[in-house]
Amino acid sequence: MDWFKRETLKQLQKKSNNSSFKVVIKTIEKCFSILTKTKNVTVSYNFDNSDLDIQHKYRSKNILSSLNRINDGYKYAIGLIANIAYRMAELNPQLRNKVLYTPGIVIIDAIELHLDVDLQMNILKILTDTFPNIQFITSTFSPLVIGSIESENLIILRKQEGN
């Protein structure tokens, strides 16, 4: 959140035109739109409450939410995706608006933690749609996560006797 606040201040003072910052904002907006099935999502930093404001349209109504007031599962998913986008943007600034197409591998342990049933069934699709050139390696105990992927993308590890 500190990074988001600093970058917002730089933008307001016209001391920066950080393309990494813009990529992270767009990624959060896209993620929130997919998660909540809403449109016209805009994210901004609110200095009064030191939180992100998320404005969106739902059933033709304009809604303003703060990140701290949304479902914990959504918060976790948005945080995870924003973190990946931030790291991609910081490591590959030369890619500018194409940074989400950075190839790589991301390892996530126990991806189902903090996610409700719907998110467990959709998190891998959201990740692969958002970052199409990333290979995600995840561990899970959730049958919902396992059931959400094609069998050719699944490796089951079993403990062997004596090991």
Task: Put a short name on every predicted segment.
Residues 1-35:
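Coupling/switch segment of ABC-type P-loop NTPase heads
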Residues 29-31, 40-41, 114, 141-143:
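Intrinsically disordered, low-complexity segments enriched in polar/charged residues with Gly/Pro
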Residues 24-39, 84, 88, 127, ...:
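Hydrophobic, Leu/Ile/Phe/Ala-enriched alpha-helical segments that form helix-helix packing faces
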Residues 38-55:
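Long, charged, glycine-rich C-terminal linkers/tails
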Residues 51-163:
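Switch/communication elements of ASCE P-loop NTPase nucleotide-binding domains
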